[in-house]
Structure formats: structure tokens, C-alpha cells
Amino acid sequence: AGDRWPHLALRGAQYLDPAGQARLLRLLRWREAQARSSNRPRSWILDNELATALARTPPADPQALQDLLDSTPKAPRSLGRALWDALQAPLADEDAMPLARAEDLDKKRLRAELRD
């Protein structure tokens, strides 16, 4: 069923405000579902960089999103409407979402280094 909080694994998430992290979580969960249903790698659906950029600065409307997708290499142009819907629709468990913080990622990296 995938990771419940996939945004915590993304380095860029720590630089987003809580609303941005919620948008990123929506996009990553949508991407996971799309990848599973189409049997494609997640990065083919929506790469981490574009997901983070959309979460940081969400487009004003569906046309602005489509224009951005049309001008971005490897963007999911044909999925613009579904991507817009995913970006806009709050998740039922967003209120329980832990926030990505720089110190958490640093602790995780330190633990990994100590194990090696």
C-alpha cells in the first residue's frame, strides 16, 4: 500500500511550509496510485523535482498548470486535469501528517552513517 507519508523521504519537503507539504503529499500519493494503475515507474508519472515545485508554488488554475506541463520536459502533459484535481483535493488524514524538518533528515543520515 506504499508509504503513508512519502513526503518525509524527499529532501525538498523540509523547505516547504505546512500547506506546501500537504500539497506535496497529495501529489506523491496521486503519483503512487497512477504508477500502480499504469504499471509504470513513479518518476515516469511525475518526478520529484516537478512535484516539489508544484507543491511550493501551485499554479493559479488548470490552464496555468497545463501551460507549465507543456513547457516542462518529461512532464505528464496528458494528466494535467487529474494532476490539478490531486493538487486541489485535501486528503482525509492531512491533519495527522508529520512535517518534514531538516533536523529529522540530518538525524536519519547520521544514523545511516553510524551503521556503515
What does each of the following model-derived ranges do?
Residues 1-116:
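Accessory DNA-binding and partner-docking regions appended to nucleic-acid-acting proteins
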